[in-house]
Amino acid sequence: MSAVPLTRMLPLRFLTHLLLLSFIPLYFCMEFSEDARNIEKIRRGNQWAIGHFMGKKSLQDTYNPSEQDMDSEDFRPRIIEMIRGTFRQEPIRALSPRKQDEIQWMLKKIMDDYIKTTQK
């Protein structure tokens, strides 16, 4: 009975694995390179929001209020200016320490409730 020693089988096994594993990445590289050639044939449709042209078309169609809108209750110029002033001043105004504590307490309560519901 002739048995092949283990020391002689290990190099052959290593060589076999090396050859097999070297072809697997080659197969995937070839598969992806073939798909890249077919991308040119895909119809892409309207590409107005691509790259540096992004948003150009949508800015041309902005809303212009009509006279009827300006006369309505919602579009009075004074109300619009008050709203703009509020938005400009809001980030500048600092919160009082009491208000900060209230907000922190609410956020803590929300987070606690969230953690309790996710653990169930």
Curated annotation (Swiss-Prot):
Signal peptide positions (record): 1-29
Tissue specificity comment: Brain, intestine, and ovaries and early embryos (stages 2 and 10).
Principal location: secreted
Domain of life of the native organism: Eukaryota
Methionine amide PTM sites in chain numbering: 54
An example Gene Ontology CC term for this record: extracellular region
InterPro entries the UniProt entry points to: Bombesin (IPR000874)
Keywords (A to Z) from UniProt: Amidation, Cleavage on pair of basic residues, Secreted, Signal
Its job: Stimulates smooth muscle contraction.
Listed name of the protein: Neuromedin-B
Protein's organism: Xenopus laevis (African clawed frog)
